[in-house]
Regions:
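Acidic, glycine-rich active-site loops and adjacent beta-strand->loop/helix elements
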Residues: 49-54, 79-85, 124
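A glycine-rich phosphate/pyrophosphate-binding beta-strand-loop-alpha-helix module
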Residues: 10, 58-114
Length: 164
């Protein structure tokens, strides 16, 4: 598809309203197409938020992942750059000096050492490169905001969904 088709589809879906069935189906397909891998014993938490609150708040999902990790929780934080909000998890971390572009082996090593790892969505969902420019152009919440918390490339036992 070309960018205009993707843009029309995403805007039309927003105007219609995204159904639970559409989110579920899209999440299943995204997970099937993602570059999945195992990390740790599988007993960990993702704090991926939906972003795009329009409230211009700080990145709650990343902040909450640090709080949980400080309390001893094992975190596999899935996230992206800001599309429809002020600061995405990737923005928060890179502005803090973190390298978010690691290969799987390095991610596993980091997780094994510190119990926390950030999974930069575009590295694990290769098809996203086709929709990212359109999402940036639209600059508002789309179905992809809802998919983030459900498409972590590693299996996790718990998901916390931060809210503002």
């Amino acid at each position: 598809s070309n960018d205009e088709d993707i843009e029309s589809f995403l805007i039309g879906l927003n105007e219609k309203g995204v159904s639970e069935t559409e989110v579920t189906a899209a999440a299943i397909v995204m997970k099937e197409k993602s570059l999945r891998f195992d990390i740790g014993d599988g007993s960990h938490i993702d704090t991926c938020g939906t972003g795009g609150t329009g409230l211009h708040t700080f990145n709650c999902s990343t902040a909450s992942s640090f709080v949980a990790a400080a309390g001893g929780a094992k975190i596999t934080k899935h996230g992206n750059k800001a599309i429809s909000s002020k600061s995405g998890s990737a923005d928060f971390l890179t502005q803090s000096g973190a390298n978010i572009n690691h290969e799987r082996e390095k991610l596993i090593s980091i997780f094994d050492k510190v119990g926390f790892v950030f999974l930069f969505a575009p590295l694990h969902h290769e098809a996203m490169k086709f929709v990212m420019p359109v999402r940036q152009k639209i600059a508002e919440k789309t179905i992809f905001n809802l998919l983030g918390p459900h498409t972590n490339p590693v299996s996790y036992t718990h998901l916390t969904l931060p809210t503002t």
